[in-house]
Amino acid sequence: MAAASSMALSSPSLAGKAVKLGPSAPEVGRVSMRKTVTKQVSSGSPWYGPDRVKYLGPFSGEPPSYLTGEFPGDYGWDTAGLSADPETFAKNRELEVIHSRWAMLGALGCVFPELLSRNGVKFGEAVWFKAGSQIFSEGGLDYLGNPSLIHAQSILAIWATQVILMGAVEGYRIAGGPLGEVTDPIYPGGSFDPLGLADDPEAFAELKVKELKNGRLAMFSMFGFFVQAIVTGKGPLENLADHLAGPVNNNAWAYATNFVPGK
C-alpha cells in the first residue's frame, strides 16, 4: 500500500501538482465535530489547552491523547474512554450541556419555592415532588395554589403540552433557527442570546466552562434530591435543616442503616 502510494505520487503526470490525501475516518469525525465550534480562546486561559487545569491538579498524570483541552469542561479525565470516538464524543458533549441546563433550572425549581415558603410566602404546596403529585388528587393542581391561574387535572394533558412545547423549542434549535443559519446547535446564539453574552469570544469561552461546572454540580444535586425524596419524604431545605439541627442522627449513613435487613 505504501509502495503503491509512493509510486503514484512520483508519477510524471503528477509532477508539479499538489496532491491532497483524504483524511481517515476518525479524522473526518473529529473535523465534522469541530466545525460547530468557534475557538478564539486566549493562550493564557487556565481552562483550555495542554496546560489547562486537570482533575487532580499536579497529580493528574498525562491525559488521553484525544483530550486536548479544546472543549470546555475538559479536565483530562476519561477512565471509561467515552470521548475516544469523535462522533460519540460530539453526541455526549451536546447531551451533557443540554442536561446541565435542565438540571440547573430543575434544582432552582426544587429549592426556590421551599425557600419562599419557609419565609412566609404562601402559594400552595412548596415541596417539589409533593406539588407535582397534586395532579393525581381529586381536585387537581392549581398553579401557585391559585385556582384562577392554570388548573390541571390530567397528567396526559400536561405530558402532551410539554412534548409539544419542548419539542418545538428543540426542533427550532437543532434546525438552526427559522432560516437554518445557526451553525452550532449547542450554543446557537442569536435569539437564544438576547443579552449578547457571546459577543466577546474570550468571555464566552469562560462562560462555557462556568456553565458546565455548575451544570455538573446541578445534575448531582438533582440526583440527591431524588434520593432524599424517596428516603426521607422531605424537600431539600427541610432535609438540610434537619441535618444542621442533628447531624449525628440526620445524615446519609443513618438513613442507609434503616434499610439493613433485620433492623
From Swiss-Prot:
Binding site for chlorophyll a 5: 210, 228
Binding site for chlorophyll a 1: 77, 83, 96, 216
Binding site for chlorophyll b 1: 55
GO molecular function, one term: metal ion binding
GO biological process, one term: photosynthesis, light harvesting in photosystem I
Family: Belongs to the light-harvesting chlorophyll a/b-binding (LHC) protein family.
Protein name according to UniProt: Chlorophyll a-b binding protein 3, chloroplastic
Organism of derivation: Glycine max
Gene, per the UniProt record: CAB3
